[in-house]
């Protein structure tokens, strides 16, 4: 199986963060679920959890506070 490029990994992270921020803007942070983010990003739960274990980790990555 070929390795996934760093560019692909970064693009996928940005896709998930963008989807999360759209959900947060619509529903607020606490009411937004990881499933909402998965749906908005058009990805499976497994794909999203591969990059981020929680909503908090998405925010930390977006804010560069990890």
Predicted regions and their residues:
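A short, mixed-charge helix-start or loop-turn motif at secondary-structure junctions
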Residues: 1-5, 52
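Residues within the helices of the helix-turn-helix
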Residues: 4, 35, 46
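Alpha-helical structural segments
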Residues: 11, 15-22, 26, 40, ...
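Conserved hydrophobic/aromatic packing and binding residues within compact polymer-binding modules
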Residues: 16, 37, 48
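Short helix/strand-capping hinge loops at secondary-structure junctions
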Residues: 23-32, 52
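Ser/Thr-centered, proline-biased regulatory motifs
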Residues: 30-39, 56
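DNA-binding alpha-helical recognition surfaces that contact promoter or target DNA
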Residues: 36, 50, 60-61
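Short hydrophobic/aromatic patch on the recognition helix
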Residues: 42-52
């Amino acid at each position: 199986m070929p390795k996934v490029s760093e560019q692909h990994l970064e693009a996928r992270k940005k896709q998930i963060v963008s989807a999360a921020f759209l959900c947060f803007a619509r529903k607020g942070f606490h009411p937004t679920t990881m499933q909402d983010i998965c749906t908005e990003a058009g990805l499976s739960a497994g794909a999203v959890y591969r990059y981020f274990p929680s909503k908090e980790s998405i925010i930390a990555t977006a804010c560069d506070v990890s």
